[in-house]
A protein has these predicted regions:
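A contiguous loop/helix-start segment that scaffolds small-molecule binding in enzyme catalytic cores
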Residues: 2, 156, 163-274
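Loop/turn-to-beta-strand initiation segments
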Residues: 3-5, 75-79, 155-156
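Short glycine-rich anion-binding loops that position phosphate/pyrophosphate groups of nucleotides
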Residues: 12-13, 83-87, 163-165, 223-225
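Short active-site oxyanion
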Residues: 26-32, 105-108, 156-157
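Conserved helicase motor
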Residues: 56-62, 136-139
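Glycine-centered tight-turn and secondary-structure capping sites
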Residues: 92-94, 251
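Class I SAM-dependent methyltransferase SAM-binding "motif I" and its flanking Rossmann-like core
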Residues: 95-153
Length: 274
């Protein structure tokens, strides 16, 4: 009988956030797939858990994923963890989930802390709709294309960033998006946790000197609805809604989605659909 892969969340800084269910899961499985076994060993030692581990990270995920799945198919249970937070989110564990799906292996989630959701919650920005953009590429062309594709994004945007890349990213956000609200969230759940609610302009001028230290989540205000892009017309908005309807969306849902894309009011688009 095949085993189970447990997708297990770990603390993002404060060990007190490790849930009893997560601890019980790591205690009960046959082995643990860890992004960095040295980091996970510290967590296990803190909670007195002794369990064999295998490394599973970006550069060995293809070969190691097959080995992990083979062991699960032979009846072993495995927990996958990342260094901090939920595995499989902006993380090579995503590929292991896909492999499990292909091979019919059952997966169970053991929820834990999430830097994305935690940062959004304290950002002071709109939380109803948001998009997680992960880390921006270090490649200048790819980075520019990524940011350029978000210029008309109305939803709140969330980025991860490393300390050594933060200065350039702050300058880029102001360059591509103009002056918008920005929350710089650093060292979540740790001793020096801080939420800096500012603007892209102020951040580019005052925080791009490399003085801020730690791990960062950047939460950026989306484009305001009234800022209609010149490239969109009402006709385009209505056509967009009609395509959504053809694909199975209800008229009200289609109008709402087309409004979020083009900046026109939902009711304005809906009237044209009737």
């Amino acid at each position: 009988m095949s085993g189970i892969l447990y997708v297990t969340g770990t603390p993002i800084g404060n060990l007190g956030d490790f849930s009893p269910r997560a601890a019980e899961t790591l205690e009960s499985v046959d082995f643990i797939a860890a992004e960095d076994t040295r980091v996970t060993l510290k967590l296990l030692n803190h909670f007195g858990i002794k369990k064999p581990m295998v490394s599973y990270f970006e550069h060995n995920k293809r070969e190691r994923g097959e080995i992990i799945c083979n062991r699960i198919e032979q009846g072993e249970n495995c927990a996958i963890v990342t260094d901090a937070g939920m595995p499989c989110i902006s993380d090579p564990g995503e590929d292991l989930i896909k492999l499990c799906e292909e091979r019919g292996i059952k997966t169970v989630v053991i929820p834990g802390p999430s830097a994305v959701i935690s940062a959004l919650a304290v950002s002071g920005l709109e939380t109803g709709r948001f998009t997680f953009e992960g880390f921006l590429s270090v490649n200048k062309k790819s980075r520019s294309e990524h940011l350029d594709s978000l210029k008309n994004e109305h939803r709140t945007m969330i980025f991860y960033e490393a300390p050594h890349k933060l200065p350039q990213t702050l300058r880029d956000l102001y360059s591509f998006f103009g002056d918008r609200k920005l929350s710089i969230v650093r060292e979540l759940t740790k001793v020096h946790e801080e939420v800096i609610r500012t603007t892209t302009k102020y951040a580019a001028e005052n925080y791009a000197d490399g003085s801020l230290k730690g791990e960062f989540v950047l939460v950026l205000e989306g484009k305001k609805q009234e800022e209609k892009s010149e490239e969109y017309t009402l006709e385009f908005a209505v056509q967009t809604a009609r395509k959504l309807i053809e694909n199975g969306a209800k008229p009200t849902e289609a109008a709402k989605e087309a409004a979020s894309i083009t900046g026109f009011k939902k009711n304005e688009i809906y009237r044209e659909l009737l």
